[in-house]
Amino acid sequence: MCQKKPFYITTPIYYPSGNPHIGHCYTTVACDSIARYRRMQGYDVMFLTGTDEHGLKIEQKAAEKGVTPKEYVDEIVKTFKGLWKFMNISYDRYIRTTDDYHIETVQKIFKELYDKGYIYKGEYKGKYCTPCESFWTESQLIDGKCPECKREVTEAKEEAYFFKMSPFADRIEKLLTETDYLQPKTRAVELVNNFIKPGLEDLCVSRTTFKWGIPVTFDEKHIVYVWIDALSNYISALGYKNEKFDEFDKYWPADVHMVAKDIMRFHAIIWPAMLMALDLPLPKHLAVHGWITFNGQKMSKSLGNVVDPFVLGERYGADAIRYHIMREMALGADSAFSNEIMINRINSDLANGLGNLVSRTVAMVQKYFGGTLPTERESGEFDDDLIETATSLRAKVDDFMDKTQLQNALAEIFKLVSRANKYIDETAPWVIAKDETKKARLATVLYNLLEAIRIACTLLSAFMPTTMPKALEQIGACEKCAGYENCDKFGVLPADVTVHKGDALFPRIDVEKEIEELNSIIKNNEGESEETKALREELEGVAQIGIDDFAKVDLRVCEVKTCEPVKKSKKLLQFTIFDGVKDRTVVSGIANYYKPEELIGKKIILVQNLKPAKLCGVESCGMILSAVHGDDLKVVFVDNMPVGSKIC
């Protein structure tokens, strides 16, 4: 196969403020699978990952432990690299923002943007979120908190350098709305409406209130703010403005940046603006995925709901974990993680599906032919359908991989696995074996199964790189037979192929027993935070009701027409609400969470048949539905349903 063009794929560089968990794994495993698949196709692949090691949070964490920031990140980086080795991640380069060559690149980029007039000195006044290392304006806050992580923000005022964003607003809007740069493209609307339409504000790109960062060469009391520092890794790692590497012209622009949705804005808006200012080509695709959630929440050490991938991998093998997280998550959507979902997926797809197919087929070749098939063949019913399913598979998987739809690619491969298992039931080799005159037909059935397994396992080797070579060895597929170039062909294995019995690829798991042990090891309850524990205990104490009780509550979509504070009360707001038939007055104690003007015109959910009650002299005819978590409260808004719609 002729050499194809270079292919450059990147993960975000991870922030090493603590040890990695399974939530970190998805992006890296997904990128690794794409990189491996492209290598199979003959591409010259550069797969980059790394760590973002500067900032106030690192400085604070190091101080807490009594070590220097560099000593602190050195230890955490060992854990990240150890996890990637454990998960069989085939990255080509690991960049650290503390590397000398990266520092050189960042300083040169900052100076060039300053010389071009895109960076200027001013004074920053506003809000700062330390965990996200992000500046926000008052209008961008949600309930006074960081819109990304929902944590408290602090007042910040300091001399700073700013990057002019507005000159690039039109080009960025076209990039998001008129090209396939952003995947899934549905996210473009929220970015345009939330950040570009209101007017791109200049970006604070330096700090003076902490020292752990890259100094600005011409004003060393300033350090380069995290996003110019971190985002530049994608080009510094190729040798842009440094002499460490000489591969920028070869690999840039990147084919795929893959990131989680919480850093989408930086990669969809800030990074393109930086590249435009530098007169550099833009990346081809930004693939944005959701979060792996646990009990409905994003995995977070602060919530005590993280899952240790080392524990899972040691019990089930890294390939099973790789498969599970890729099979469960669709691009752009969140994916719920639970021990039960994971174990059932491993059992159904890997143990009962693929593993059973391989072991049954190999066992039958050994039982009926001593491990080596005869060369005589006899076609029969069901052969053509299996062969068509197998030979058409590669093109379908190629298409999904081109779209970074790994979940769909895996689902397509397992259609072949299911078809092959069905073929066994349809042809019943154990029945054919009873007729001595049908040896050729029996050999054909088993050969067809081996070929289907060869194609499936070859394509799956990008996703499960440890186990699939073992499967291919068991069915007697040599390295050449197991090549990508042969995945659209049938009849590649030698006619007299010899199989080799091996250990079970994916042993079946006792679900109940394993969940009990996992709960003990991972400490889903004992290791939970006080916040999660309190919530669990609260939920456990809630009395159950029947459907008849629930049916008595009339919940309707209503529209807020007016809203104003209630006199003599700091907590109450008075609403005029239209329920689809008439206006009604409602009083709600949410004044500490919303300004009246924020609620006018909104569609909310109202408990309509609540007995009227007087609050501060105002009769309230209903109750507005809100969600409460700790000290936080949010009204439940309904955007796309007509007023008067019943909630059921």
Where are these regions (language model features)?
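N-terminal catalytic cores of NTP/NDP-binding nucleotidyl/phosphoryl-transfer enzymes
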Residues: C2-I76, I95-K111, D115, C132, ...
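A glycine-rich helix N-cap at a beta->alpha junction
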Residues: K78-S90
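Structured secondary-structure scaffolds
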Residues: C2-T49, Y101-T105, E155-K367, A409-I413
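Cys/His-rich short segments
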Residues: K116-A169, E173
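Helix-rich, typically C-terminal accessory recognition domains appended to large enzymatic cores
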Residues: K121, E328, A333, I341-E378, ...
